[in-house]
């Protein structure tokens, strides 16, 4: 059993070391990162990858909806100012070193065999693999809902943590760059359900890391103020209501938890479409 666990640990470390080399060797001179301990290499890889993802996704998103599709998705008068977007970038950059510490810590725990994470499908079939992904996402959705709600309901937490994000409370101050503009501890608290779920549900290493980093794209999308009206997705239309009312639509991926716990508010456009269907 000890040998099996040691083999598992070695396999995971070899895999994460490969990811470190794959990212860092293309971005930095070898002499700057290779002497670092494995944990610091992992954090540096996550930090650089997180920044690249944030800027590329944010820039492309803004360029498309504010310039290429001007007045198509967002009215000209509702486009956030350059000053507002630069402030959001500044807040996100202050927090980024701390955000990217979380996946480094989760990888450390995975490498030491403390979680239910796995790196091969040797002991699972594809059906179980997808079932566990679904359970993982349900757990994450449930936990993020309650973390987010308590960040509003507990006044101390709101004042000292979550209020930083709610500086952006109007359509003309929200942009994709606001997606990661949090107090560092606030951002970590809302991402930590991904780590807690590792101890409850078996999940593939790549799936866990991919979902963590896809959060960057997801949070950009729900701050663009464009209501996609794709049921039951908690899109930007719902999240814009959250930023303006402060007491609705705490959910993350879907409207499920808000519907279950009575905090759902449907965007006006969707209400109108419902009325038309009833007629």
Curated annotation (Swiss-Prot):
Q: Does the keyword tRNA processing apply?
A: no
Q: Can you tell me where the transmembrane regions are? A: 48-68, 127-147, 194-214
GO CC annotations on file? endoplasmic reticulum membrane
Matching InterPro entries:
Fatty_acid_hydroxylase, Sterol_Desaturase_Related
* Gene name for this UniProt entry: HDF7
Q: What the record says about its domains? A: The histidine box domains may contain the active site and/or be involved in metal ion binding.
Q: Where is this motif: Histidine box-3?
A: 239-243
A Pfam family reported for this protein in Swiss-Prot or TrEMBL: FA_hydroxylase
Record-given protein name: Putative Delta(7)-sterol-C5(6)-desaturase 2
Q: What is its main location?
A: endoplasmic reticulum
Residue ranges of the Fatty acid hydroxylase domain? 134-263
Q: Where in the cell is it found?
A: Endoplasmic reticulum membrane
Disulfide bonds listed in the record = none
Keyword hit for Transmembrane: yes
What are its cofactors? Answer: Fe cation
| UniProt superkingdom | Eukaryota
**What EC designation does it have?**
1.14.19.20
Residue ranges for motif Histidine box-1? Answer: 148-152
Task: Provide the reaction this enzyme catalyses.
Answer: a Delta(7)-sterol + 2 Fe(II)-[cytochrome b5] + O2 + 2 H(+) = a Delta(5),Delta(7)-sterol + 2 Fe(III)-[cytochrome b5] + 2 H2O
Regarding protein family, the annotation reads:
Belongs to the sterol desaturase family.
Q: Which GO terms describe its biological process?
A: sterol biosynthetic process
Topology of this chain in the membrane: Multi-pass membrane protein
Renumbered to this chain, motif Histidine box-2 spans: 162-166
């Amino acid at each position: 059993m000890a040998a099996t666990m040691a083999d598992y640990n070695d396999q995971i470390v070899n895999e994460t070391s490969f990811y470190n080399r794959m990212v860092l060797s293309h971005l930095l001179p070898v002499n700057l990162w290779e002497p670092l301990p494995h944990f610091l290499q992992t954090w540096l890889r996550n930090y650089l990858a997180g920044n690249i993802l944030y800027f590329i996704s944010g820039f492309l998103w803004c360029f498309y909806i504010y310039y290429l599709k001007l007045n198509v998705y967002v009215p000209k008068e509702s486009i956030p100012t350059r000053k507002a977007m630069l402030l959001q970038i500044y807040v996100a950059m202050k927090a980024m070193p701390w955000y990217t510490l979380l996946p480094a810590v989760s990888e450390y725990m995975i490498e030491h065999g403390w979680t239910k994470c796995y790196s091969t499908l040797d002991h699972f079939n594809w059906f179980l693999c997808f079932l566990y992904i679904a359970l993982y996402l349900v757990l994450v959705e449930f936990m993020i809902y309650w973390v987010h709600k308590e960040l509003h309901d507990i006044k101390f937490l709101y004042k000292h943590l979550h209020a930083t994000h709610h500086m952006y409370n109007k359509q003309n101050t929200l942009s994709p760059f606001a997606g990661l503009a949090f107090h560092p501890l606030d951002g970590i608290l809302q991402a930590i359900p991904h780590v807690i779920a590792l101890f409850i549900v078996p999940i593939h290493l790549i799936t866990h890391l991919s979902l963590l980093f896809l959060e960057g794209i997801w949070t950009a999308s729900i701050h663009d103020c464009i209501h996609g009206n794709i049921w039951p997705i908690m899109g930007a239309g719902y999240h814009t209501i959250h930023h303006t009312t402060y007491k609705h639509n705490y959910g993350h991926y879907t409207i499920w938890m808000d519907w279950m716990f009575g905090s759902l508010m449907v965007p006006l456009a969707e209400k109108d479409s419902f009325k038309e269907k009833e007629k």
